[in-house]
From Swiss-Prot:
Keywords: Ribonucleoprotein, Ribosomal protein. Residues 104-176 are annotated as: Disordered. Disulfide bonds: none annotated. Belongs to the eukaryotic ribosomal protein eS10 family. One of its GO terms (cellular component) is cytosolic small ribosomal subunit. Residues 108-139 have a biased composition (Basic and acidic residues). This is Putative ribosomal protein eS10-like. Transmembrane segments: none annotated. One of its GO terms (molecular function) is RNA binding. The keyword S-adenosyl-L-methionine does not apply. Coiled coil: none annotated.
Length: 176
């Protein structure tokens, strides 16, 4: 598709800077939201990315009426050559995250003088309410640990099955 070179360069610059590109599948959208200041139509973004996809520069995903394009290593090299960028500049997806602060230094809650409440710590109370008892029964496993759960699954010990008609459909057979 013919498009102005300034639009193609704007699309390639944004893709190289971010490392990813998102576009809604709407060819009639007047401007792409991330390139609205440069007046680049959404159709130009979709077609430029289609061209890069056919060259193997991006990988495409589509979900919920949106295209997602991810820059590949070959694509970053191609865009670096196309935009005349030095090798020190890399897409944002290849930047290393900032150092992780240890959890002891960065707490989400402020410390108080009051001690934290003690939990049950594996002990069950002597008396459970009906709701708690139902939940407790559900959580307990009837199969001992280490047993084969798949062998235990199925119809159980019933070897004879019978079909009884319901809702007046067909003639019900008397039980045998």
């Amino acid at each position: 598709m013919l498009m102005p070179k300034k639009n193609r360069i704007a699309i390639h610059e944004l893709l190289f800077k971010e490392g990813v590109m998102v576009a809604k599948k709407d060819v009639h959208m007047p401007k792409h939201p991330e390139l609205a200041d440069k007046n680049v139509p959404n159709l130009h973004v979709m077609k430029a990315m289609q061209s890069l996809k056919s060259r193997g520069c991006v990988k495409e995903q589509f979900a919920w009426r949106h295209f997602y394009w991810y820059l590949t290593n070959e694509g970053s090299q191609y865009l670096r050559d196309y935009l005349h960028l030095p090798p020190e500049i890399v897409p944002a997806t290849l930047h290393l995250p900032p150092e992780i602060v240890p959890a002891t230094l960065h707490r989400s809650r402020p410390e108080t003088g009051r001690p934290r409440p003690k939990g049950l710590e594996g002990k069950r109370p002597a008396r459970l309410t009906r709701r708690e008892a139902d939940r407790d029964t559900y959580r307990r496993c009837s199969v001992p640990p280490g047993a084969d759960k798949k062998a235990e699954a199925g119809a159980g010990s019933a070897t004879e099955f019978q079909f009884r008609g319901r809702c007046g459909r067909g003639r019900g057979q008397p039980p045998q």
